Amino acid sequence: MSLLTEVETPIRNEWGCRCNDSSDPLVVAASIIGIVHLILWIIDRLFSKSIYRIFKHGLKRGPSTEGVPESMREEYREEQQNAVDADDGHFVSIEL
């Protein structure tokens, strides 16, 4: 029983590929998709934390305050802080 597959065949003491239809557009497209998938997977593994952080929080860190008077900016900051402080009351301390 041989361990050789249909693709791998010994040719004159070397291993070769018996792929006569490798110029088929479907084979070429599948190869390109496979290579792109591999590259994207490697990039994802290397930079996953920074990529997901960008998608989660976006590139901006909040609404633009350009052209807004300082008094309105301060009022907005206070409203945001009050909203955060109000949410603290929703947490329940469970002691076992």
Swiss-Prot record:
One of its GO terms (biological process) is symbiont-mediated suppression of host autophagy. The M2 protein from most influenza A strains is inhibited by amantadine and rimantadine, resulting in viral uncoating incapacity. Emergence of amantadine-resistant variants is usually rapid. It comes from the Viruses. The keyword Phosphoprotein applies. The modification Phosphoserine is found at residues 64, 93. Residues 71-80 have a biased composition (Basic and acidic residues). GO terms for molecular function: channel activity; proton transmembrane transporter activity. Keywords: Disulfide bond, Glycoprotein, Host cell membrane, Host membrane, Host-virus interaction, Hydrogen ion transport, Inhibition of host autophagy by virus, Ion channel, Ion transport, Lipoprotein, Membrane, Palmitate, Phosphoprotein, Signal-anchor, Transmembrane, Transmembrane helix, Transport, Viral ion channel, Virion. The keyword Coiled coil does not apply. Belongs to the influenza viruses matrix protein M2 family. When the channel is activated, one or more imidazole moieties of His-37 probably become bi-protonated. Homotetramer; composed of two disulfide-linked dimers held together by non-covalent interactions. May interact with matrix protein 1. This is Matrix protein 2. It comes from Influenza A virus (strain A/New Zealand:South Canterbury/35/2000 H1N1).
